[in-house]
């Protein structure tokens, strides 16, 4: 699916189904709105999927994997070889997201869109666009053509999920250095100084953190990415994993597939997707608010409320995995609980 085809296929989520799902919640024999954000999540799923009868199975978490040339600048504790190692663990079902997803009844699909390793990793879907990005202090991270190609690889994964019968998606990422690229992207899209949106990632020292902020600030100064053109921003200071996630969200919206975000990095890509095609927002669900400094900022920019505030910042799609059991519980209440009429009790009324 080309990016233009995906964007053209996106339709706004059904407002009629939103109203019907809200009405169903109001009929359930419990205090109005008492399941909080979980009620809104079920409403969003009904509207996005086009069905009042909410179905949450089967489901899969797609993890976009790619390496970032910016690691050369000392912005991480580990080398980029770790990306392929963790992706391989995902393929074997041994990574953190895999163990959590197994408990949540979800498949995990790791996708190589830009790992630096030359050899294919067994069990990892190969959609490689390039062998990592460039160091954005030396050159733009990607060409615009590479960025679009990665976005289209992401959109194709959404189509594949839909064709395989999945009704709910989750999103994750793996790429050493991608808290740097996502912070750079958010600095551009939110028009904020890098220091405000940059955290310590996987545990940088104060000196390392200061270096990270300096690198982002310098990369933005050199390339002047446009906050009005997310593809330009992705190309100049982003990453292949971020671009693929951006396309994945656009593809999910095009397919009518609700998709759960993880944390900061998936949120940055989601913001890029929404800036490209605003209707994508209606297909997104926030899982948790990341402990990274910009975690709350990106959700505010998206207008999404997370159900979980647990100080998480692991990545991989673990936040999406954590939300799924909560959605199951909420869907059970939505679907099976008696109505006020059925138990012969006067319904609650909304206070004006």
Segment roles from a protein language model:
Residues 2-352:
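N-terminal loops that bind phosphate or other acidic moieties
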């Amino acid at each position: 699916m080309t990016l233009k085809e995906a964007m053209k296929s996106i339709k706004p989520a059904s407002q009629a189904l939103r109203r019907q799902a809200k009405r169903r919640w109001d009929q359930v024999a419990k205090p109005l709105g008492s399941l909080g954000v979980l009620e809104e999540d079920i409403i969003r799923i009904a509207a996005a999927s086009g069905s009042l009868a909410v179905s949450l199975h089967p489901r899969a978490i797609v993890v976009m994997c790619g390496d970032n040339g910016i690691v050369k600048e000392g912005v991480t504790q580990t080398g980029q070889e770790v990306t392929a190692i963790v992706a391989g663990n995902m393929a074997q079902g041994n990574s953190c997201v895999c163990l959590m997803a197994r408990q949540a009844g979800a498949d995990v699909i790791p996708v190589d869109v830009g790992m630096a390793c030359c050899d294919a990793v067994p069990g990892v879907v190969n959609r490689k666009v390039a062998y990592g990005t460039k160091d954005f202090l030396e050159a733009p991270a990607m060409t615009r053509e590479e960025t679009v190609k990665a976005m289209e690889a992401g959109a194709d994964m959404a189509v594949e999920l839909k064709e395989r019968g999945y009704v709910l998606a989750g999103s994750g990422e793996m790429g050493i250095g991608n808290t740097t690229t996502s912070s750079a992207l958010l600095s551009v899209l939110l028009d904020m100084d890098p220091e405000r949106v940059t955290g310590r990632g996987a545990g940088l020292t104060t000196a390392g953190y200061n270096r990270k902020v300096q690198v982002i600030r310098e990369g933005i100064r050199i390339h002047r990415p446009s906050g009005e053109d997310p593809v330009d921003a992705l190309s100049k200071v982003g990453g292949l994993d971020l671009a693929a996630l951006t396309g994945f969200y656009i593809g999910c919206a095009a397919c009518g597939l609700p998709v759960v975000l993880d944390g900061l990095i998936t949120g940055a890509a989601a913001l890029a997707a929404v800036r490209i095609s605003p209707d994508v927002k209606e297909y997104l669900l926030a899982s948790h608010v990341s402990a990274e400094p910009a975690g709350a900022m990106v959700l505010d920019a998206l207008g999404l409320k997370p159900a979980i505030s647990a100080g998480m910042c692991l990545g991989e799609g673990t936040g999406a995995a954590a939300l799924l059991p909560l959605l199951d519980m909420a869907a059970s209440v939505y679907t099976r609980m008696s109505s006020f009429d059925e138990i012969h009790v006067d319904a609650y009324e909304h206070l004006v």
